[in-house]
Amino acid sequence: MIIFIIILALVLCFNVGVYAAYALAATEVSYTKKDGTTVSVKDALDELNKKVPTKSIGDEVTVGGEQFYVLEWDNNCDTVNLISKYNLNKAGTAQQDATYGTTGCAFSSKNYWGSSSNINLNDFIGCTETDAIGKAKSYGRSKGAISSRLLSYEEVDKLETKTNSISIYKMLYGRKPYGEGNYLRFWLGSASRIKNNVWIVAKDYGGIRPVEYYNESNFGVRPVITVLKSKIS
């Protein structure tokens, strides 16, 4: 019995030593930069994060040559959630600073969620590339986003309690209160409790309200994308 305990102790000590060696090696992983200097991976990540200044909700940033608003910011995360400054064009390939009629499209070609109500459709099986959610996802991929979707009803509900902030008001509705320019009208990724209806945002059209999914003249696609902070400028 004593011999067994001694052997077990030796095995445990060996394993701990191996683990410690691997852990130490991991902290010493490094690579050579273009200027010939060597830097550890940890230091490189720290340097990268320092280059991205802290942002607030409603701040404007640029990704891939197009403008976005900061929707969520967490200093402890390497990623950030952004919402496009404008609706996408009808093809869904780029943002377009235009009146709502120019960017309007149907939410989808059919009701693929049935009678389900008050649910988030962003990951609901059934949407196609030509649907509003499909366009948002495709656009996000073109920007190198980790994920992309439409804004949800719950997110808008929370943001509306913060619209005493001019920057958040402008981010959500597309213009300042009593300011010049057009309000944005856009689809949300949430089904309404009314059959065949999906939620939309349009400050000049009653705020947040349900609309038939096949309405193609008034409401556009406004993507929410999740990207690495290193991609913003």
Task: Kindly label every feature range from the protein language model.
Residues 2, 13-14, 37, 129, ...:
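Generic alpha-helix initiation/capping and coil-helix boundary signal
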Residues 3-51:
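A signal for long, low-complexity, Ser/Thr/Asn-enriched, surface-exposed stalk/shaft
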Residues 51-233:
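Collagenous Gly-X-Y triple-helix signature in extracellular proteins
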